[in-house]
């Protein structure tokens, strides 16, 4: 095991694992970046809701997962793109698409964390954090 930790990959793994176990919610250690990513997932309809929980430390994000009428998770794919050992960036002209625009890309830009659609609207690029479908 290497000494490098990747909080974003851990966050995404916790969401995937909770969905596989068909949990109604999952508690994840909070950070500004994870909160921003979770807000995007909420706005785009991939989760039901989330709340901040004070635990006398860094806090927790309680993410309420969303399933369809057949108990299939709303998030079908959650893939980490840029990693600590291999950062990936895209400028505003070359932002990737997921499933021909049906999914979203989450980016960290100079204007904050946003979806690919928002980044196109603002004409900014940034680090490609994740792809969601």
UniProtKB/Swiss-Prot annotation:
The protein's assembly and partners: Part of the 30S ribosomal subunit. Contacts proteins S5 and S12.
PROSITE patterns: RIBOSOMAL_S8
This protein's name: Small ribosomal subunit protein uS8
Protein family membership: Belongs to the universal ribosomal protein uS8 family.
GO terms, biological process: translation
Transmembrane segments: none
NCBIfam families: PRK00136.1
Keywords, comma-separated and alphabetical: Ribonucleoprotein, Ribosomal protein, RNA-binding, rRNA-binding
Originating organism: Salinibacter ruber (strain DSM 13855 / M31)
InterPro entries per UniProt: Ribosomal_uS8, Ribosomal_uS8_CS, Ribosomal_uS8_sf
Entry keyword annotation includes Nucleotide-binding: no
One cellular-component annotation, GO: ribonucleoprotein complex
Role according to the record: One of the primary rRNA binding proteins, it binds directly to 16S rRNA central domain where it helps coordinate assembly of the platform of the 30S subunit.
GO molecular-function term, one example from the UniProt record: structural constituent of ribosome
RNA-binding in keyword set: yes
Gene behind the chain: rpsH
Family matches, as SUPFAM superfamilies: Ribosomal protein S8
């Amino acid at each position: 095991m290497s000494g490098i930790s990747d909080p974003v990959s851990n966050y995404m793994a916790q969401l995937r694992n909770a969905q596989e176990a068909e949990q109604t919610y999952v508690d994840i250690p909070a950070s500004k970046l994870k909160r921003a990513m979770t807000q995007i997932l909420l706005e785009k309809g991939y989760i039901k809701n989330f709340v901040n929980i004070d635990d006398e430390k860094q806090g927790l994000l309680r993410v309420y997962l969303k399933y369809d009428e057949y108990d299939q998770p709303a998030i079908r794919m959650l893939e980490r793109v840029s990693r600590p050992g291999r950062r990936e960036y895209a400028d505003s002209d070359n932002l990737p698409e997921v499933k021909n625009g049906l999914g979203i890309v989450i980016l960290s830009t100079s204007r904050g964390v946003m979806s690919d659609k928002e980044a196109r609207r603002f004409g900014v690029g940034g680090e490609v954090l994740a792809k969601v479908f």
